[in-house]
């Protein structure tokens, strides 16, 4: 249970960071990195 929860949170953070990079490069200009 604890391992599954930790893995899910890790996957969520990883996916979010990837999304931020993509939005930063291909965004509408509101996110400027």
Curated annotation (Swiss-Prot):
Chief location: membrane
Topology class, membrane: Single-pass membrane protein
Chain segments annotated as transmembrane: 2-22
This protein's UniProt keywords: Electron transport, Membrane, Photosynthesis, Thylakoid, Transmembrane, Transmembrane helix, Transport
Cellular compartment(s): Cellular thylakoid membrane
InterPro entries: Cytochr_b6-f_cplx_su8_sf, Cytochrome_b6-f_cplx_su8
GO annotations of cellular component type: cytochrome b6f complex; plasma membrane-derived thylakoid membrane
Record GO terms (molecular function): electron transporter, transferring electrons within cytochrome b6/f complex of photosystem II activity
Family: Belongs to the PetN family.
Subunit architecture: The 4 large subunits of the cytochrome b6-f complex are cytochrome b6, subunit IV (17 kDa polypeptide, PetD), cytochrome f and the Rieske protein, while the 4 small subunits are PetG, PetL, PetM and PetN. The complex functions as a dimer.
Function: Component of the cytochrome b6-f complex, which mediates electron transfer between photosystem II (PSII) and photosystem I (PSI), cyclic electron flow around PSI, and state transitions.
Name of the featured protein: Cytochrome b6-f complex subunit 8
